[in-house]
């Protein structure tokens, strides 16, 4: 009897040792079934953290987004920390909002991600439609100057407004603009204070060094989508989950190699371009050559090459290619270049200040940058030839919108589209060959020439992403960050090549992984 008891106890303890002693749960509140809005909740033993907190793109702002009409679909105060894969808005755009919505923890990222966010926040915060603020301004403006609107509690200028002249309103910036009849510009001190407050909440981790965060060992590994971009490895016990973030590509002039992912139990991988192929290096080089030729041809004819692009990384890649085109003789070396976005200019300067951020040292383009002009007037600068860089890349915001009525109607202008164009945007209409586009409620005839290029994409194609997954053929693979067609095509391709352990992530579904 005693032998049987001992045998039973031994078997019980052995089984208990092999059994799971906990679980990691993953729920996607954004980035599932859509491009953008990336936001995944990772939980274990009562510890709750987010991987990314991004803004959604496109027209679908309902079921699959992290956004909801009342804010977040989870309690921000319940989140212990937030990990950020990189600084693009679709992965980090809601950081200011969640910071003001009850979240009290730290943001974790690489140093370049933190530093790039600090550069893009000033322009984002001015018109951030997701954040409700207590706005304060004076009814009286000295000397007819534009009134400044304040919102930060520590702003000394807001404190100097007399009770008689003090005006206030609570709501988003759009609601404020609809409420007042005068022009209000953002207080610089409030902007700087809010950026400093956000930066102070960041903790940074070096690449490839495990960091203890709650019950997890978290490792940031470079994926070279933009400077600082990381795949995030989350390990507990013997289990490891990987979140790819956005994977880079050899198509970028600034990237040489991307190391494959390490083996993991589960991989959540982006599927932006589905199972599509870029055509290989020769096709990409031919596309770059076509871009340089088109820009050079336009300038030599006395026309304007207009390149709308995202302020963060896309403008910098385009600028570097323009400088290379001038060095090769494809583009006139004396062509005037205009870069209107202060954010894009600040990021460009940061690239020069930190050559270690990229695989390629771009400081050869610094002389061109020093003569680049920050202002552009269509009536003065279209004639004679030149190159214009503006935001936004989809031409639905920033300087691009204001310039469309003058430039889209001018046959001397060639629009060079270098990024994704969401349906409903002016950029999408131009790329689709529209004869008219809608700008501010007006129909504008299109007389400009329009070209489109895919070589500037920061995302890897199917073959590149397969190579990144090479060590994970036996892993569970989950597809995120893609539209329905791209996700379906990507799943089919991966099942054919990797096996049947591939699934498309559903929004709000709880995925559980036992911890051993």
Predicted regions mapped to residue ranges:
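Core dinuclear metal-dependent hydrolase active-site scaffold
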Residues: 21-77, 196-256, 379-381, 387, ...
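Bacterial N-terminal signal peptides that target proteins for export
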Residues: 1-9
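Active-site neighborhood of phospho(di)ester-bond hydrolases with catalytic His/Asp-centered motifs
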Residues: 51-54, 79-88, 92-95, 107-110, ...
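N-terminal signal peptide c-region/cleavage motif recognized by signal peptidases
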Residues: 15-17
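Cap/insert and terminal regions of metallo-dependent hydrolase folds
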Residues: 227, 231, 250-339, 414, ...
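Pre-active-site segment of Zn-dependent metallo-hydrolases
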Residues: 32-37, 44-197, 249-257, 432-440, ...
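A general structural motif
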Residues: 284-288, 365-377, 393-396, 431-436, ...
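Hard-cation-handling environments
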Residues: 291-426, 480
């Amino acid at each position: 009897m005693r032998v049987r008891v001992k045998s039973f106890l031994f078997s019980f303890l052995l089984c208990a040792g092999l059994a799971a002693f906990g679980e990691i749960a993953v729920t996607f509140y954004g980035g599932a079934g859509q491009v953008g809005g990336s936001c995944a909740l990772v939980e274990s033993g009562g510890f709750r953290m987010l991987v990314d907190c991004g803004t959604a793109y496109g027209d679908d702002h309902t079921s699959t987004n992290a956004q909801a009409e009342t804010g977040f679909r989870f309690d921000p105060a319940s989140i212990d920390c937030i990990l950020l894969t990189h600084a693009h808005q679709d992965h980090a755009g809601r950081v200011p909002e969640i910071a003001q919505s009850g979240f009290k923890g730290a943001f974790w990222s690489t140093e370049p991600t933190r530093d790039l966010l600090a550069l893009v926040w000033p322009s984002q915060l001015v018109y951030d439609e997701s954040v409700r603020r207590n706005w304060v301004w004076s009814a009286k403006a000295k000397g007819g100057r534009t009134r400044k609107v304040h919102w930060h509690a520590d702003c000394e200028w807001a404190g100097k407004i007399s009770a008689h002249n003090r005006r206030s309103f609570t709501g988003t910036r759009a609601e404020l603009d609809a409420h007042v009849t005068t022009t209000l510009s953002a207080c610089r001190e409030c902007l700087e204070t809010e950026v400093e407050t956000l930066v102070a909440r960041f903790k940074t981790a070096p690449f490839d060094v495990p960091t203890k965060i709650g019950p997890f060992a978290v490792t940031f590994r470079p994926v070279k989508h933009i400077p600082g971009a990381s795949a995030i490895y989350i390990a507990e016990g013997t289990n490891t989950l990987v979140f790819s973030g956005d994977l880079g590509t050899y198509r970028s002039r600034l990237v040489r190699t991307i190391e494959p992912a390490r083996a993991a139990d589960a991989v959540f991988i982006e599927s932006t371009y589905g199972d599509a192929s870029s055509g290989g290096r020769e096709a990409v080089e031919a596309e770059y050559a076509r871009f340089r030729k088109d820009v050079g041809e336009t300038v030599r004819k006395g026309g304007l090459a207009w390149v709308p692009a995202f302020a963060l990384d896309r403008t910098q890649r385009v600028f570097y290619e323009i400088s290379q085109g001038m060095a090769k003789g494809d583009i006139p070396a004396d062509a005037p270049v205009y870069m209107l976005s202060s954010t894009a200019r600040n990021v460009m300067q940061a690239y020069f200040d930190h050559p270690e951020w990229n695989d390629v040292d771009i400081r050869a383009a610094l002389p061109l940058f020093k003569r680049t002009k920050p202002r552009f007037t269509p009536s003065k600068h279209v004639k004679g030839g030149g190159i214009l860089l503006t935001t936004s890349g989809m031409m639905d915001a920033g300087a691009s919108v204001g310039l469309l009525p003058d430039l889209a109607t001018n046959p001397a202008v060639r629009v060079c589209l270098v990024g994704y164009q969401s349906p409903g945007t002016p950029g999408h209409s131009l790329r689709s060959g529209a004869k008219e586009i809608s700008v501010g409620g007006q129909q504008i005839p299109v007389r400009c020439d329009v070209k489109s290029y895919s070589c500037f994409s920061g995302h890897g194609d199917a073959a590149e992403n397969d190579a990144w997954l090479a060590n994970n053929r036996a892993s569970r693979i989950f597809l995120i960050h893609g539209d329905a067609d791209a996700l379906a095509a990507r799943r089919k391709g991966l099942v054919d090549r990797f096996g049947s352990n591939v699934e498309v992530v559903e929004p709000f579904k709880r995925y559980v992984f036992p911890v051993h």
